Swiss-Prot record:
Primary site of residence: membrane
UniProt xrefs under InterPro entries: ECF_substrate-spec-like, UPF0397
NCBIfam families according to UniProt: PRK13661.1 (NF010182)
Membrane topology note: Multi-pass membrane protein
GO CC annotations, alphabetized: plasma membrane
Protein name: UPF0397 protein lp_0150
Segments passing through the bilayer: 12-32, 45-65, 76-96, 112-132, 151-171
Family membership noted in the UniProt record: Belongs to the UPF0397 family.
Gene3D superfamilies recorded: 1.10.1760.20
Record has Cell membrane as a keyword: yes
Length: 186
């Protein structure tokens, strides 16, 4: 019971702090791409780390809340199709936690290659398939506009995660003690 309660507290705290960090990164550290309403999102690199440490619930909720707050502050109201897709991408990144196991302090090349292939596929599904289709169905946006935005966002977010996310994952894994690496002194 104690472990389950401490895990839920940890998840709530990670969600709150993660949402705040994602909001700040989306609001102040995004790099415009030249295509309207798209940017290179540094927050996605952080999201990869958040998901790998805290799992799907914390990552999904943190990016959902952070993105919704950013849209509300920036545009006056959230663009729900993209906010929801970001939340789903956060969940997907969190599902990689058990495969990456960065808490063990070992994050080899094979795991990094797997994760980057995985995140490119996840970003493709989210930004090229789901978000633009949602924009067309819900907001009646022109298909050529939203699919262009989706493709640009897929490329930008995939690059952000591949560079920033990979660096953060490697640096974090290096701070963890490898299992079985400590020996008792006599």
């Amino acid at each position: 019971m104690q472990n389950k309660q401490s895990n839920s507290i940890r998840t709530v705290v990670a969600t709150g702090i993660g949402a705040a960090v994602i909001f700040v990164l989306m609001k102040f550290v995004a790099i415009p791409t030249g295509v309207p309403n798209t940017q290179v999102n540094v927050a996605m690199g952080f999201l990869a780390l958040l998901g790998a440490i805290f799992g799907p619930v914390a990552a999904g909720l943190a990016v959902f809340i952070g993105h919704a707050l950013n849209d509300f502050v920036t545009y006056g109201s959230p663009w729900w199709t993209w906010v929801i897709v970001d939340g789903l991408i956060g969940v997907a990144f969190g599902l990689a936690k058990n495969r990456l196991k960065i808490e063990n302090g070992v994050l080899g090349t094979a795991k990094l290659v797997w994760f980057n292939i995985y995140q490119i596929i996840v970003n493709f599904i989210g930004w090229v398939l789901l978000a633009p289709t949602g924009d067309i169905i819900i907001y009646h946006e022109p298909a050529n506009k939203v699919y262009l935005q989706g493709v640009i966002t897929w490329i930008a977010d995939s690059i952000s995660v591949a560079i920033i996310g990979t660096i953060l994952l490697v640096l974090y894994a290096r701070t963890r003690t490898q299992r079985g690496s400590l020996t008792k002194e006599r």
